[in-house]
Amino acid sequence: MKRENPNLFGALLLGLLLNTLLSSQTAYWARIGLLAYPLSAGLLISAALLFAWAWRGVERRRWLRFALGCLLGASSALEVLRFWRLLERVAPDSQNLLEVCLLLLLPVLYLRRVSAIAQTANVVLAALLIAGGLLILSIAGDLQVANLQPVPAHDRQWLQALRGQCLLYPEFLLPALWPDQEKRSPHTVIRLVGYSLAFSVGMHLILELYFGATMPEQEIPVHAAAQGGALSIFNRLEWLQLLLWAMLVSIKLALYLYAGIRLLGGRNSKTENTAVGLDRFPVYLLGMAFLCMLWRGIDLNRLFALRNLAAWLFAGLVLLMGGVQWLFAKRSSSV
């Protein structure tokens, strides 16, 4: 049964953790983020669960499936561009955009089958936890409680924290697409939201303890902290750190591709452990390369903000349509 329906929770969680690791800047102060955690978690859990409930009633509509597929495709291109921008800052002129596309997309050939995504995600998640432990050990001597900023909890700080936490990533919506009822349970969404927000708040706390008042000014703060730590492993083996992040992005791209194929195939996908056909991969590769070339000169922060707005609007539209359909069905059954 496991082979037919692999557990993709690890891949979903990796995709969410990646958003914090590759963030170009911190989003809020740790104390305000901790206070905003319950409200943000409640909003995201409610949105994801309501979307999953409404999606079951409207999933047959092809234009909705196509719209969600477009959202996943655009998100994939943004992930490639974000990693390319990171490489540009870390090692300028080291790789062009086409090379980065090939670096990230070619591993998706191996990750075409869902079982490969699940197994690879679990291995990479373990490696990420080890790397995180080494990072904390490396900068432990520079973590100072005095660096925590006494920021007053004004409306502006609250709004900044909520904007940084209430991001409706596609990973929160994808469990609604899985055929296995157990993987669509509320428990899955609650764990995803809880773990990802806790990781975000925890990383902001560590970075604030390390950088202090200069934390918002740091570019790619997680990488900057790793390079400034006491352990030389992050300097000498920087390529290994970048390779780990590249694998994270490739797993995320493979997950989005699998979800997109499920959307296009509708209910024809009988089992969850299906493989993306090789005949579709050239179209996918060319499409990603085209979008990346098209958007390479646009501000990524603006594109990610538009993606988040599109995700919230799409979830709201699905909820509205699902709610209307449920009301009509209830009225017709009572007549």
Regions found by a protein language model. Give the residues of each.
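Hydrophobic, membrane-embedded alpha-helices of multi-pass small-molecule transporters
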Residues: 5-24, 36-51, 68-79, 98-102, ...
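Membrane-interface loop-to-helix entry segments
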Residues: 97, 109-139, 307-319
